[in-house]
Amino acid sequence: MLVSSKSIAWLGAALIALAVVAAYSTGLRTPFQYDDLSTVVENDSIKHLSDLHLVLSPPPNVTPTSGRPVLNLSFAIDYALTGLNASGYHATNVALHLVAALLLFGIVRWTVRLPAVGLESPADFIAIATAAIWAVHPIQIGAVTYISGRSDVLMAVCYFAVLAAAIRALPFDAAQGRGSPHVSAWTVVALVACAIGMAVKESMVTAPVAVVLYDRAYVYDRFATALRERWRLYAALAATWAVVAVLLIDAPHSASAGFSAGISPWTYLLNQVLVIPEYIRLIVWPDDLLFAFGEARLLTLADVGAIGLVAPLLVVAAIWLWHRRPALGFPAVWVFLTLAPTSSIVPIATEAGAARRMYLPLAGIVVLFVVGIYRITQRRPRRRASSARPLSLAVAAVLIIVLAATTAAQNREFASPEGLWRASLERWPSRLAHRNLAAVLLQEGRRSEALEHLRAAADQGPLSRYALGVALFDDGRVGEAIVELQRAIDESPNEPTVALEGRRVLARALAQQQRHREAADVFAQVAALTPGDMAPRLSRADELRAAGDLPGAHEEYQRILAAQPDHSGAQTNDGLTLLRLGRVSEALPLLRSVAGREPRNTAAFMNLASAAAAAGRVDEAVGAVCHILADDPRNRSAQEFLADLRRAAAAARVRVADCPAR
């Protein structure tokens, strides 16, 4: 009995869904990992879905979502539905991954039927095998199981949607040679998907180029013809580049990516020619989980060696294949086109490489592999040709099962933070792995082990040295912490975390060592980096006061109060500073203000009592102390202060009223 192509398509979609669930269900209980903390747990902008302006304006310090409003919105929806239950976020990632796989299935199924390919008969097999292998390959774990990897998954959904809609928007059915009645609608779908994708991740910028190359490879015999027939679509898609431009202006990534990221394009390129062969190894033989490659290293040509020829030769081979046979060349060019935004000469200082960057590029490799397997089996001797289709199916089925089982197993490894970073350290040693393993060990109270890893990474970058400094500070080794933190700041004064958080910890460390003037200077630097935050200004003023610079402290407190007149900390400490300066009449209003706003603040009323007593306002001082005792009759400090007041009053022959009866 013949089965219709439509029925096979539905069956194929079901098989792909089954494979995805089998491969990734083991990762649903994985806790928040690595950047997930800043992306979700500490990201306040996703916790108020009703405030769309806040949701669509993620803070610049949340690296995975900065300048990516649609990505941030997806996390906000998850938070509204599941709170901080990591399983809900994982389920969304898996669902989006399945959507991407089904879109890839449709794209391949349509494409192999085109005259330029001429594989009408095995189209369903090739499409199902391609989408399933792509979906369950272990290298995809970094994008699917890693919650913050959603940027790659959601962007890929948009990328595939653009290509699928562009195919459906052809002014004629390329396979059947007849007109399409829905050109305008599919054009709009392609345009909307492209614009949304640009607001998910910047790597979407190559999507318009991919559409042009696809048309040339499979539909038109010349670029000129494609441009003449579809220039409006190409122009509309290219116009969405403005979305990326606006978002990058609003939330630049200059500290972590781009030509001002602290890594030269040449150095970054040398890192890529080492990383890309490792990607290939993980694709061909995914025997282990390699999550991250760490920050870019300072390399020379001598460090790269002969392996540095692999990536350039593959690029040349892809271009050669494109010129010889565009239909086969497109998947090869696709690999480098989709990889280029993260793996060429534009530096990403925080990551030299990551397996999740192969999320989209893998599709091109799998297409070439599946078509290659089919072609090889078709070239068997004529008398055995009848077994070619079953053999192709068997090879694909076995591969899908093995890959899905491997992915399921590696997902379990991913679920352990310590196991994840130990595995990364064993397979690709980096300061990132040392640093994150140390963070896990610190959480478990294994401080000596953690410090060993931080010391191993300290000489490899300022972030690692900063982490070592923080760990030493938390361990009470303040002098050592100051040395490491100062070195980290000197080595990389513009690195965001080091520049801000490093200075915060350094200032606290200096204060603990009674180096108050130095601490005040560092707090001033923190205040300059966070102009709207009064906390470092208050700390600076407090350190000036501790250093004996009372006039300087008073001036700093006044600056805070000019910006926030009811700032209790500034009012309290300025009032105490004025008392030490003998300016009691100026101190009293400040201390009264704090006590009036905070009736249960014992310290505020004690300060007011002291100031009132110094001003000779005994009744007011007694009233403040009585207020404390009314709430806490056993407060020893208040009792002693009241007794002192009474003795002083008796000596001066001044009558002091009793506290009101409770």
Question: Where in the sequence are the language-model features?
Answer:
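Polytopic membrane enzymes that build or remodel cell-surface glycoconjugates and lipids
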Residues: 1-474, 535, 573
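C-terminal luminal/periplasmic domains and tails of membrane-associated envelope-modifying transferases
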Residues: 2-3, 382-387, 418-662
